[in-house]
Amino acid sequence: MSIKNKFKSFFTLDDEEYEYEYIDEEREPVQEEKGTKDKAAFQERPQTGKQNVVSLQSVQKSSKVVLSEPRVYAEAQEIADHIKNRRAVVVNLQRIQHDQAKRIIDFLSGTVYAIGGDIQRIGSNIFLCTPDNVDVSGTISELLTEEEPQRW
């Protein structure tokens, strides 16, 4: 017997080996009165193509806001990871040197831009970094201090 015939006999069934038994059952007539009412009620309802489906992104466990006060530039990556994980971050840069704070803001601005989020100044050296799933409304007016000259 060739290999081809072996595969053929393995994958095919011989009809002679199996006899199918057909059982004829007598079925009781179904009461049409109840079924007709249910069908009529079902057909009266207008069929719309739109189902009640909820997007997975709209259902979240809970939103978190992370408060961060970096002391060195190396902590900027940890803040960026929070933003990438779709958490809003408030960054307080009051306890870091100005040049380091500027580098952190530049780094976070790139991160926020890459994910389609937003960065806003909410106070003196305090910034709010938000991903695209967080909407911020309203503004905070700047308070002028005696140290800062007025910019005309």
Swiss-Prot record:
Biased composition (Basic and acidic residues): 28-42
Region (Disordered) residue spans: 25-54
Keywords for the protein's UniProt record, in alphabetical order: Cell cycle, Cell division, Cytoplasm, Septation
GO annotation terms (biological process): division septum assembly; FtsZ-dependent cytokinesis
Protein location: Cytoplasm
Any Pfam family hit: SepF
Keyword flag Ribonucleoprotein: no
Matches recorded under InterPro entries: Cell_div_SepF (IPR023052), Cell_div_SepF/SepF-rel (IPR007561), SepF-like_sf (IPR038594)
Function: Cell division protein that is part of the divisome complex and is recruited early to the Z-ring. Probably stimulates Z-ring formation, perhaps through the cross-linking of FtsZ protofilaments. Its function overlaps with FtsA.
Subunit: Homodimer. Interacts with FtsZ.
Entry protein name: Cell division protein SepF
Organism: Bacillus pumilus (strain SAFR-032)
UniProt gene name: sepF
